Amino acid sequence: ADLESKMTPDTHAMIVCNPQNPTGNVWSKEDLLRIGRLCLEKQIVVLSDEIHSDIVRDGHSYVPFASLPDKAVVDNSITFNAISKTFNLAGMKNAYFFTTNPVLLSRIKQHHRGDLSTLGVVANEAAYRHGAQWFDQVRPYLDNNHKIVESAVAKMPGVSVTKAQGTYLSWINFSSVIESVDASEMAIRNGKASPEHYF
């Protein structure tokens, strides 16, 4: 209901990040279908950002938006991806997108200026052709990093961590500790405060 209330007549697109950045939530097929059908009903195009799609923790499954069993929902979407997260190759200027909808594709071609990097094209091809074995070793390493952080945080009084289902990010909540030592007031007194809206 909250999501639907934010879909005004001025809303023309919705970005669905899967896995979600920064929380690491991996969307279920049912949730994606619900979001997709709601967007279709409201004539809102789904922009599916799947840049973290390969980085999913054990016990969770990534569902590509374009694989959903409702053709109308899929046709109302554009999927985006890149090698930057999976293969740690940010800056290659070689992200890509696709859609099953020829009308959306035509609109994109009309307004999108392609800006590929030659090095990025080579890196993309090399990563996808030869990087699977490397990434098969990285995935459990990243999962273990999450477990190390979660174990360490579990021993810290007043501190918690959101257990991510995907991505390599960990979000640690220090708010109880910060409040208990009045850190905000301390930062102001010492001239180290930043506007909260930056975070």
Residue positions per predicted region:
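PLP-dependent class I/II
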Residues: 1-199
